Amino acid sequence: LRGVYLADQKNHIDHHTIIEHEDEHCTSNELYKGILSGKSTAVFNGRIHVHKAAQKTDAIQSNQNLLLSDDAIIHTKPELEIYADDVKCTHGATIGRLDEKGIFYLRARGIKKEEAQKMMMRAYIGEVLNGMKNSKAKETLLEKIIENIPEGE
C-alpha cells in the first residue's frame, strides 16, 4: 500500500488506513509520504491489525513527511495491533525538512536552489513509486506529482 500527498495553502488531508492480517505468512508494506507547505495540515492514522492466527506475519508501516514551511502541520499516528506472538512488524513516522547540506552540494555544482529542491523532492517521492513495473506510467505519474509539489517558504 503506497501513497503520496501534497498540501499547500490551507489544505487539509486525512489518511486513515487499516491493514488486516488474518492468516499465517501474511506480508504488507505500507509507505505514505507527504510534502506540506503554507498553513496546510495533514493527518495519517494507519493501523496494522495482526490476528492471533496470523503467525509468521511480516508487516512494515512507515509515514514520512517533509514540511516546507513553519506553519505546515502533520499529525501522524502509525499503530500496530498484534495478537500473534511469532511476527516481525515495524512501524514509524518521520517529520523533517529538505536536507540543507544536500541542497548546498547541488548548488555548489551550479544547480539553482529551486531546481535542487525539486530534484531532492523528486527522489523523496520516487521511493513510493519504485514498485511500479510499467516504467512509462511510473515516469508520467512522477512528473504529474512533481508539477503539483507545493512551493516552500
Could you tell me what each predicted segment is?
Residues L1-F104, A108-I111, I125, M132-E153:
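Conserved beta-strand/loop scaffold segments within soluble protein domains that form the structured core
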Residues R122:
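Short, conserved phosphate-binding/catalytic loop or strand-edge motifs used
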